[in-house]
């Protein structure tokens, strides 16, 4: 399904963590008279500020940022709910003649917003049974079952990610189809200009390490401690966020703070690689250099790309 030529434009700024997406989103919104719509699943949570690198109010430079701080840390993330909220914001901006700019590295959230993606329903009885089995037998056993039922899904879901494994098995049982059959293709709902920010791996790894250091120095441990008191540990999604999961382990006496800091760096580097792989599978994403040699030119190259697409 291809939108008609007159379909309004949506811009996405995607790529791995620490690539420089947020600043580029602010620049484009200022130049195009638009607003930023958050597409980072963990920035949806209230109070998760330091560890998600959420822009402060001064850093937003007056640009409205939508879909930040909308969920409590005890709530489980829902791509279907995000899709509803994001499309509402997109449609509002388009109706006002303004430019929606989705910014974030949560690939499924971006696709859910701009592509034709329908979510299978849920069955509380099936979900409860699978979650009980997860608690009793562990994610490894369920991952083996998923591998037998849908090898492609098993390859794309970490064996340690019990929540996603349970969801995949639930969908298979409800629909009678492989979980991957329900994953999004590239059928657009909106005519989108998709910009990927590309940073070479050695430089990106250095940025990630420095960012984690800044987060610790800015008080991430205290932020997690306060969120723990607000129910973070019980949140199935928020408690797994990078940095937060590791510090919760410190607060539980399971590791040292130095160990948690080092593991946060390692886990974030692995996560950045998975993000990069996800977005590179989408041929519609145009990649622009965001490394130190290109950083000064990135905003103007992105603006030129958008302007050419709009006038094409």
Curated annotation (Swiss-Prot):
<comment type="subunit">
    <text>Monomer.</text>
</comment>
<keyword id="KW-0460">Magnesium</keyword>
<dbReference type="GO" id="GO:0006400">
    <property type="term" value="P:tRNA modification"/>
</dbReference>
<dbReference type="GO" id="GO:0052381">
    <property type="term" value="F:tRNA dimethylallyltransferase activity"/>
</dbReference>
<dbReference type="GO" id="GO:0005524">
    <property type="term" value="F:ATP binding"/>
</dbReference>
<keyword id="KW-0547">Nucleotide-binding</keyword>
<protein>
    <recommendedName>
        <fullName>tRNA dimethylallyltransferase</fullName>
        <ecNumber>2.5.1.75</ecNumber>
    </recommendedName>
</protein>
<dbReference type="InterPro" id="IPR018022">
    <property type="entry name" value="IPT"/>
</dbReference>
<keyword id="KW-0067">ATP-binding</keyword>
<feature type="region of interest" description="Interaction with substrate tRNA">
    <location>
        <begin position="40"/>
        <end position="43"/>
    </location>
</feature>
<feature type="site" description="Interaction with substrate tRNA">
    <location>
        <position position="127"/>
    </location>
</feature>
<feature type="site" description="Interaction with substrate tRNA">
    <location>
        <position position="106"/>
    </location>
</feature>
<feature type="binding site">
    <location>
        <begin position="17"/>
        <end position="22"/>
    </location>
    <ligand>
        <name>substrate</name>
    </ligand>
</feature>
<comment type="similarity">
    <text>Belongs to the IPP transferase family.</text>
</comment>
<dbReference type="InterPro" id="IPR039657">
    <property type="entry name" value="Dimethylallyltransferase"/>
</dbReference>
<feature type="binding site">
    <location>
        <begin position="15"/>
        <end position="22"/>
    </location>
    <ligand>
        <name>ATP</name>
    </ligand>
</feature>
<comment type="function">
    <text>Catalyzes the transfer of a dimethylallyl group onto the adenine at position 37 in tRNAs that read codons beginning with uridine, leading to the formation of N6-(dimethylallyl)adenosine (i(6)A).</text>
</comment>
<keyword id="KW-0808">Transferase</keyword>
<dbReference type="Pfam" id="PF01715">
    <property type="entry name" value="IPPT"/>
</dbReference>
<keyword id="KW-0819">tRNA processing</keyword>
<dbReference type="InterPro" id="IPR027417">
    <property type="entry name" value="P-loop_NTPase"/>
</dbReference>
């Amino acid at each position: 399904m291809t939108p008609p030529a007159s379909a309004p434009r949506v811009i996405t700024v995607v790529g791995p963590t620490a690539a420089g997406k947020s600043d580029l989103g602010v620049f484009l919104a200022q130049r195009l008279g638009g607003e930023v719509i958050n597409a980072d699943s963990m920035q949806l949570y209230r109070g998760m500020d330091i560890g998600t690198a959420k822009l402060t109010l001064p850093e937003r430079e007056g640009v409205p940022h939508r879909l930040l701080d909308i969920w409590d840390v005890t709530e489980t993330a829902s791509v279907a709910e995000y899709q509803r909220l994001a499309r509402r914001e997109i449609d509002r901006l388009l109706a006002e003649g303004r430019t929606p700019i989705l910014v974030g590295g949560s690939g499924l959230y971006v696709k859910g917003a701009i592509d034709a993606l329908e979510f299978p329903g849920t069955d509380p009885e099936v979900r409860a049974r699978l979650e009980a089995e997860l608690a009793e037998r562990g994610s490894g056993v369920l991952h083996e079952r998923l591998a037998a039922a849908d090898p492609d899904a098993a390859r794309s879901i970490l064996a340690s990610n019990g929540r996603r494994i349970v969801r995949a098995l639930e969908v298979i049982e409800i629909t009678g189809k492989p979980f991957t059959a329900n994953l999004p293709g590239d059928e657009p709902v909106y005519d989108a200009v998709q910009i990927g920010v590309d940073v070479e791996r050695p430089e990106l790894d250095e940025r990630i390490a420095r960012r984690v250091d800044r987060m610790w120095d800015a008080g991430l441990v205290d932020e997690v401690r306060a969120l723990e008191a607000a129910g973070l540990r019980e949140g199935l999604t928020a408690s797994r966020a990078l940095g937060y999961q590791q510090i919760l382990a410190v607060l539980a006496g399971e590791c040292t703070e130095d160990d948690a800091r080092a593991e946060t760096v390692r886990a974030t580097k692995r996560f950045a690689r998975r993000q990069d792989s996800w977005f590179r599978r989408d041929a519609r994403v145009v990649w622009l250099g965001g490394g130190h040699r290109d950083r000064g030119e990135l905003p103007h190259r992105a603006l030129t790309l958008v302007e050419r697409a709009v006038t094409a």
